[in-house]
Amino acid sequence: EWCGTNSDCGEGECCTGGSFNRH
């Protein structure tokens, strides 16, 4: 699953600085 903005983060392992990271 992917997220694109910090507001998408909830697990503490995604989206830092608006970057795309898996979580």
Curated annotation (Swiss-Prot):
Keywords assigned: Secreted
UniProt main location, coarse: secreted
Any one GO cellular component localisation term in the record: extracellular region
Domain of life: Eukaryota
Tissues of expression: Expressed by the venom gland.
Subcellular localization: Secreted
Family label: Belongs to the u-CNTX family.
Record protein name field: U22-ctenitoxin-Co1a
Organism name: Ctenus ornatus (Brazilian spider)
